C-alpha cells in the first residue's frame, strides 16, 4: 500500500518535467509513476515510452528511492491501441488503467 501519493513537476533548463501520478510503497520498495490521458482517442505506446524516459531522466526519484522497483501506469478514458496493449503484454511493470477500473 503506498504511503505517499502525489504528482511530480520540475521546471529546469531542459523544460518542464511532469509526472501525473507518483506513489511510493516503502514496504515493498516500489515507486509507481503514472500518466493520465483523457482524450477522445485510444492511447498509443509512445505515451508509455515518454513516461519511462521522464522517470529514467528524473534523478530525484532515483536518489530518493535507491533500489526501488519502478512500476508504470497509463490511465485512459478512451482505451488503448493494439500497439499499447502489445507493449503491456511484453512488460509486466506496465499497468493499463481504463475508465472502467476507476471508481
Question: Where do the protein language model's features map onto the residues?
Answer:
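A cross-kingdom feature that marks ATP-driven nucleic-acid transaction machinery
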Residues: 1-103
